[in-house]
Amino acid sequence: MPAAWPPRTVIRKSSGLRTLESALYRAGLGPVAGVDEVGRGACAGPLVVAACVLGPNRLESLAALDDSKKLNENERERLFPLIRRYALAYHVVFIPSQEVDRRGVHVANIEGMRRAVAGLSLRPGYVLSDGFRVPGLPMPSLPVVGGDAAAACIAAASVLAKVSRDRLMVAMEDEHPGYGFAEHKGYSTRAHSAALARLGPSSQHRYSFINVRRLVMDGEPEEHGEVGCGKMLVDMPVDGVLHEGQLSR
């Protein structure tokens, strides 16, 4: 029986994105799935979680893979169809804002990771998650701090989640005009705060986030910066899922 944890390979940042996965494959623990999320800090829109399995060999077509936050929009859009083409399996899960409110963002994140892994058409032998331990998986797993910059399968999942969520937020602009979702993607900006104060929260906003909840409670928007949307105040379920072959391009 293979070991539950990867061999104690020394992984240096300069080693490249495939080093950890390669060690797992050599130990007989493949296929290796990476899982990552996008949208934890947004106060509107879904939390999106992706799982992705890449083959054991490095592909030149995916050489530009990196943490999706380090890639610009054009780079992510170029990689998105390539990942879908060359991945052995992938699965993208959308956790709606109502479920984030009901469960709390961390619990919703972990549940989303479980769903994403469970939805893969190829059962992984090992799962690498970005930063968080994912209890309840039926296979061994390892949280990797900064995983989207340390493992190719996590980086691929990061790009799938980011592009899927960004496209959804752009489409959401037509359904909820005036909030600027196409620009800020549901994250907190001055323009978003001004729209919230003017229009009030939409059905896509997370009422458990303090800056949204305060508008409901007393009509006063919270002052905040550009990157977060305030802390959660409380710990509902329709689940959207992107399977292989869905979402154009």
Swiss-Prot record:
Catalytic reaction annotation: Endonucleolytic cleavage to 5'-phosphomonoester
Disulfide bonds: none
Named cofactor requirement(s): Mn(2+); Mg(2+)
EC numbers for this chain: 3.1.26.4
Keywords: Cytoplasm, Endonuclease, Hydrolase, Manganese, Metal-binding, Nuclease
Example GO BP: DNA replication, removal of RNA primer
UniProt main location, coarse: cytoplasm
Domain RNase H type-2 as annotated: residue spans: 30-221
Cofactor binding note of this UniProt entry: Manganese or magnesium. Binds 1 divalent metal ion per monomer in the absence of substrate. May bind a second metal ion after substrate binding.
InterPro entries to which the protein is assigned, alphabetical: RNase_HII, RNase_HII/HIII, RNase_HII/HIII_dom, RNaseH-like_sf, RNaseH_sf
PROSITE patterns referenced in this protein's UniProt entry, alphabetically: RNASE_H_2 (PS51975)
Pfam family, one: RNase_HII
One GO MF term attached to the UniProt entry: RNA-DNA hybrid ribonuclease activity
Binding site residues for a divalent metal cation: D36, E37, D130
Compartmental location: Cytoplasm
One CC-aspect GO term: ribonuclease H2 complex
Uppermost EC category: hydrolase
Record's keyword annotation contains Metal-binding: yes
HAMAP family attached to this UniProt entry: RNase_HII_B
PANTHER family xref list: RIBONUCLEASE H2 SUBUNIT A (PTHR10954), RIBONUCLEASE HII (PTHR10954:SF18)
Membership in a protein family: Belongs to the RNase HII family.
Function: Endonuclease that specifically degrades the RNA of RNA-DNA hybrids.
Name recorded for this polypeptide: Ribonuclease HII
Organism expressing this protein natively: Mycolicibacterium vanbaalenii (strain DSM 7251 / JCM 13017 / BCRC 16820 / KCTC 9966 / NRRL B-24157 / PYR-1)
Phylogenetic lineage: Bacteria, Bacillati, Actinomycetota, Actinomycetes, Mycobacteriales
